[in-house]
């Protein structure tokens, strides 16, 4: 019985080939879009390296400051001094990290031009986010306090800038300053906007 139904349906579909194609294409395309959107959302908000502790992380990117006279300021432009003194000293958070959104920086080596994403962070950054280190480790709070010119790079940067050789102890020029590489991590997706970068250096 069921086999007969399939034969009848198949003959009907072949009788109107154009409409059959349009219908099947529409259904397939809709399912494809839904799969892509679902995958995008899962990749953006799901627990993936380095954001494996999202249920314990609160990200603050904008502040609202009010004055006794009724003045208000809303924006991200808060100094590191303010964050370090007043936010880091809060009792409720277990850990506090301070950093900026990544910015693009152009550097050169052997007449080759490289365009990398650069991010400034403190030492706690490496304790909060769960990066997978291929080589070395992240810099510490001591490195930040001593303004040590050290850097952590991605595997992609190591491949491009150091020809995929061991990068530990090597120097990478960022702007007019040389930074010693102390760690190499797996590449981070741009969708992970807060931890994302190609190169991380101590915030000063």
Which residue ranges define each predicted feature?
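Juxtamembrane loop-helix boundary motifs flanking transmembrane segments in multi-pass membrane proteins
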Residues: 1-5, 74
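A short amphipathic helical element positioned immediately N-terminal to and/or at the very start
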Residues: 5-14, 82-86
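Generic structural signal for small/hydrophobic residues in well-ordered secondary structure
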Residues: 13-16, 23, 44, 60-62, ...
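Short, strongly hydrophobic transmembrane alpha-helices
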Residues: 16-44
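Membrane-proximal extracellular/periplasmic loop immediately following the first transmembrane helix
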Residues: 37-105
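Extracytoplasmic/periplasmic beta-strand context in beta-sandwich domains
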Residues: 55-58, 116, 137, 170
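Short acidic/polar micro-motifs at solvent-exposed secondary-structure junctions
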Residues: 62-76, 94-124, 138-151, 189, ...
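Mid-to-C-terminal secondary-structure elements
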Residues: 124-138, 149-204
């Amino acid at each position: 019985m069921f086999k007969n139904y399939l034969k009848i349906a198949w003959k009907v579909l072949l009788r109107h080939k154009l409409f059959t194609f349009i219908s099947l294409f529409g259904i397939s395309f809709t399912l494809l879009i839904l799969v892509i959107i679902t995958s995008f959302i899962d990749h953006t908000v799901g627990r993936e390296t380095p954001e494996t502790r999202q249920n314990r992380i609160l990200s603050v990117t904008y502040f609202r400051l009010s004055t006794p006279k009724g003045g208000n300021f809303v924006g991200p432009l808060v100094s590191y001094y303010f964050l370090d003194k007043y936010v880091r000293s809060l009792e409720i958070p277990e850990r506090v990290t301070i950093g900026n959104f990544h910015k693009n920086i152009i550097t050169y080596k052997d007449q080759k031009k490289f365009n990398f994403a650069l991010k400034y962070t403190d030492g706690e950054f490496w304790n909060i986010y769960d990066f997978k280190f291929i080589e070395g480790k992240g810099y510490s709070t001591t490195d930040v306090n001593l303004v040590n010119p050290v850097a952590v790079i991605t595997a992609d940067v190591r491949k491009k800038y150091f020809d995929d050789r061991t990068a530990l102890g090597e120097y990478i020029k960022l702007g007019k300053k040389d930074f010693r590489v102390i760690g190499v991590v797996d590449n981070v997706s741009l969708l992970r906007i807060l931890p994302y970068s190609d190169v991380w250096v101590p915030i000063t």
